[in-house]
């Protein structure tokens, strides 16, 4: 086994469930009662093509030095020292606790590469807990469901990105040399005074060879299954004139221009008032889960009756979930005056969905196979933008120019001070601005900053998250201490 992974976190966040998932057997006891795991357990594990040793640990808790809990914590800290990479697990369903923040600092001080794992991401309301996890300063959360096995491809990719392919695929004979040359990096943690030379910050290039997950969504009978069948070149999915044929969220493997793609066909999404039968409610919930675990979401609109209220609600849901959206105007073969209609559709797209200015929209005919390549070219471009990262140095030089040109307005006679900006995540791009009195910052100025980011750094058509914080730079002074 080439490397070691330690699973750590507070009690009852799902560490043992994840351990069982990775080893492929129920070796660790799992229960809703916190504190079931006491000793650290080590076992051979596999995650797709990755082979490694995984350590299950007791939940980290504050405890007196001579208590059982303190000895359990010592076991966990020993596991941290043994590990090459740490999976720090939080409960996205129930959100963060002060204990999470306390032990995130313990993990950070270890200096080991850390994957922040947001478990129970399939639960209703988990998105809020996942966003809260950014404040731990451990980088972008990786949403998973250890119980249901969802999000495992992203977890695999996160481990490879941190350790590097040479390290994770090294033979056992190469382990010692791999350990010597490895230097952990966490670009998402670099903010403020912690950066000595922003221009040297490395931004990884977009990997166009990685498998891509695409969900196909829309109102009933918009032509979603027909589109997928045309892509595949076979009648893989049941289609017909009756609305609502698709019930399950079906995933199929496909390859486009040498790139592996997983397509998710979903049940037609109706208004809640029209979703009555239990089976249909389950189908819609399944479709929503497919959206959450997809990367790019193609919104299929019937070009003959586009932009119904339900279409806009679906688009808004996708944007709020932070997915990379793209519109496919289907049934284009039924349109007569195509040039005039297309101009009208582009105008409506910009006017009705201003929160993703520059959203890509492509006319297609799923039945005749027209426009599929152009649609996929735009899918790949949107996915690249969704993964885009901007160096902290470039961001703050841009921010200084923005403030000089258009400073934040004064509120109650006091000028708002903006200190610095950093990008804390991708997928979608997320930024944090440190400023005085964030609650007083007008939303109009926040939108001004978002629009400026979108235009300056070429990020059209994807959601952009921007949060304001008043706390001091948590990494300030660290560089000074190292001297």
From Swiss-Prot:
Ranges where the KH-like domain occurs: 388-472
Record-level GO BP terms: ribosome biogenesis
Residues reported in the UniProt entry to bind GTP 1: 9-16, 56-60, 119-122
Annotated PROSITE patterns: G_ENGA
Residue ranges constituting the EngA-type G domain according to the UniProt record: 3-167, 212-387
Pfam families: KH_dom-like (PF14714), MMR_HSR1 (PF01926)
Source taxon at top rank: Bacteria
One GO molecular-function entry: GTP binding
Amino-acid positions noted as binding GTP 2 in the UniProt annotation, renumbered to this chain: 218-225, 265-269, 330-333
InterPro entries (alphabetical): G_ENGA (IPR031166), GTP-bd (IPR006073), GTPase_Der (IPR016484), KH_dom-like (IPR032859), KH_dom-like_a/b (IPR015946), P-loop_NTPase (IPR027417), Small_GTP-bd (IPR005225)
The UniProt record lists the keyword Nucleotide-binding: yes
Keywords from the named record: GTP-binding, Nucleotide-binding, Repeat, Ribosome biogenesis
Keyword Transport in record: no
CDD domains from the UniProt entry: EngA1, EngA2
UniProt subunit comment: Associates with the 50S ribosomal subunit.
Family per similarity comment: Belongs to the TRAFAC class TrmE-Era-EngA-EngB-Septin-like GTPase superfamily. EngA (Der) GTPase family.
UniProt xrefs under HAMAP family: GTPase_Der
Function (record text): GTPase that plays an essential role in the late steps of ribosome biogenesis.
Protein name listed in UniProt: GTPase Der
Encoding gene (name): der
């Amino acid at each position: 086994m080439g490397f070691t992974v330690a699973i750590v976190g507070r009690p009852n966040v799902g560490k043992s469930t994840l351990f069982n998932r990775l080893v492929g057997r129920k070796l660790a006891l799992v229960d809703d009662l916190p504190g079931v795991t006491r000793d650290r357990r080590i076992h051979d594990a596999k995650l797709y093509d990755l082979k490694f040793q995984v350590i299950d640990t007791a939940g980290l808790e504050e405890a007196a030095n001579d208590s059982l809990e303190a000895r359990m914590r010592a076991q966990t800290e020993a596991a941290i020292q043994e590990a090459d990479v740490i999976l720090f697990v939080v409960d996205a369903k129930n959100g963060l606790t002060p204990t999470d923040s306390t032990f995130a600092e313990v993990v950070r001080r270890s200096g080991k590469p850390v994957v922040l794992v947001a478990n129970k991401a399939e639960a209703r309301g988990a998105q809020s807990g996942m966003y809260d996890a950014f404040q731990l300063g451990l980088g972008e959360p990786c949403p998973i469901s250890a119980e249901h096995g969802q999000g495992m491809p992203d977890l695999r990719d996160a481990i490879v990105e941190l350790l590097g392919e040479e390290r994770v695929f090294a033979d056992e004979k190469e382990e010692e040399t791999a350990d010597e040359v490895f230097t952990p990096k966490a670009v998402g943690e670099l903010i403020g005074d912690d950066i000595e030379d922003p221009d040297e910050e490395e931004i990884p290039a977009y990997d166009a060879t990685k498998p891509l997950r695409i969900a196909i969504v829309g109102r009933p009978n918009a032509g979603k299954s027909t589109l997928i069948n045309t892509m595949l070149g076979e009648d893989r999915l049941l289609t017909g004139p009756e609305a609502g044929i698709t019930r399950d969220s079906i995933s199929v493997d496909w390859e486009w221009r040498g790139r592996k793609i997983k397509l998710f066909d979903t049940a037609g999404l109706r208004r809640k008032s029209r979703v009555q039968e239990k089976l249909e409610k389950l189908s819609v919930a399944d479709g929503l889960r497919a959206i959450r675990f997809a990367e790019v979401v193609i919104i299929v609109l019937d070009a003959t009756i586009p932009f119904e209220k339900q279409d806009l609600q679906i688009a808004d849901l996708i944007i709020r979930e932070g997915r990379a959206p793209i519109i496919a105007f289907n049934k284009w073969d039924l349109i007569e005056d195509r040039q005039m209609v297309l101009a009208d559709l582009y105008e409506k797209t910009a006017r009705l969905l201003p929160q993703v200015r520059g959203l890509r929209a492509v006319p297609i005919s799923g039945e005749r196979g027209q426009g599929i390549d152009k649609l996929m070219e735009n899918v790949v471009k949107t996915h690249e933008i969704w993964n885009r990262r901007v160096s902290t140095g470039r961001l703050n030089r841009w921010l200084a120019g923005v403030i000089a040109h258009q400073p934040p307005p004064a509120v109650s006679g006091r000028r708002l001070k903006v200190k610095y900006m950093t990008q804390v995540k991708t997928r979608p791009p997320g930024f944090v601005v440190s400023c005085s009195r964030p609650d007083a910052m007008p939303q109009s100025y926040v939108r001004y900053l978002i629009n400026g980011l979108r235009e300056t750094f070429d990020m059209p058509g994807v959601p952009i998250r921007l949060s304001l914080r008043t706390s001091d730079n948590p990494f300030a002074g660290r560089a000074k201490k190292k001297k």
